[in-house]
Amino acid sequence: MREGIHPEYHHNTVVKCACGNTFTTGSVKEELKVEICSKCHPFFTGKQKIVDVGGRVDKFNKRFNIGSK
C-alpha cells in the first residue's frame, strides 16, 4: 500500500444531533452534525405514523374497475 494517501482516522469523533443528543464514534472527521438520530427518530421513539396503504389499494382498484366483476 502507498504511504500518505489515506485520511487520518479519529477514534473519538463527536456526533451532534439537532435534538441536542451527542455521542462518539470513529470517523475521518473530527466532528459530525446530523439532523436525526436514534433518540429522536420516530422508528426508535415509538411515535411512528402509520401510513394507510389500504386506501391506496382501494383507490387503484376503483380507478381500473378491478374487483367489481
Curated annotation (Swiss-Prot):
Cofactor: Zn(2+)
GO biological process assignments: translation
Record has RNA-binding as a keyword: yes
PROSITE patterns given in the database record: RIBOSOMAL_L31
Keyword match RNA-binding: yes
Family statement drawn from the similarity comment of this UniProt entry: Belongs to the bacterial ribosomal protein bL31 family. Type A subfamily.
Protein name per its UniProtKB record: Large ribosomal subunit protein bL31
Organism listed in the record: Clostridium beijerinckii (strain ATCC 51743 / NCIMB 8052)
